[in-house]
Amino acid sequence: MTTPLDGLPRGIGRPATGALAAAGYTRLDQLAGVPERDLAQLHGVGPKALRILREALAERGLSFG
């Protein structure tokens, strides 16, 4: 899966995309260094979305905090 740094992966779903945008995260690179547990607390961000985001970050040598 290739995701540009200027967006979020489509596979995370609409609820997760909306929750992340409401929290101010609209780009993949903004998630680097953010604690995964903080993102998991957002309503709409579940295990599947976190896995997809983790994989997309790892493809770029980045990770959650």
Residue ranges of each PLM-predicted region?
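Compact, charge-rich alpha-helical regulatory domains located at protein termini
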Residues: M1-G65
